[in-house]
């Protein structure tokens, strides 16, 4: 790096060592250096690369559990442009696309029909991977309300009046329900407007009022109401349990149950606290406490903690998602990291 000279940096704590090592690596990465380790074991970094500081605090990613390539979006400078990056599974950039100025994508999902759905400041848009065309989708006017989630071939969104679950694999509508989102008194968000799909695509969950979540069976359209004012909902890998606000419920009946997970879940967390959970098969990636806390990789089948991922390029927050064989991270330091999860 520096002509073969060994440079000594004195540190008095492990935290300082991590910080110094990260800034030394980052200065190399800013010059275009890409760290790659194709033989990384489970939970080890396969790639770190600098993509650029992001003016977008959401750090969007779009992945699929059936493929290793993935998409990352970042806002450049003072909203001068928004750039979509397409990476392969080893972290090489396949292409970059300019989406245009004065945009901010909060979240994005990869659909099986070769499109991305983007939540651009509460407006849903469709991006074609073939033509690179961005077209309006679902809601035409910005009402400060949006839902967007994806699981398998299914995608869930909110039109402004209805929640829709659509199967892009077979091009069929699975479920649709008219709902009104209640205005919120919480300064962090304008409306109660949250929706998600379960890992095995048998259930959807949504929240449009203060004190309850509704679970929908996507085969029978039967509903179960969960009285809970908490945050950070997630399903178990087998769709049998729904957790929210640190409590656990049977999805079939809505009955409260004991924690079925090998990790504990904190109760009483607020909207802005951290509790992020991602699922791939029996694997669950869990981040709790703070946005800079390590991500734990659990195998719920065996109950084992497989790895703890403490990425050096997370300052305050990170977004992460599973691909077919990895966990990919988009960090607030402007880095993209890939960790091996090939079991």
Predicted region positions:
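Short beta-strand elements that form the blades of beta-propeller/WD-repeat-like
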Residues: 68-78, 109, 114-119, 152-158, ...
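Short aromatic-glycine-(Arg/Gly/Cys) micro-motifs in beta-strand/loop hairpins
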Residues: 1-7
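Intrinsically disordered, low-complexity acidic/Ser/Thr/Pro-rich linker and tail segments
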Residues: 21, 32-85
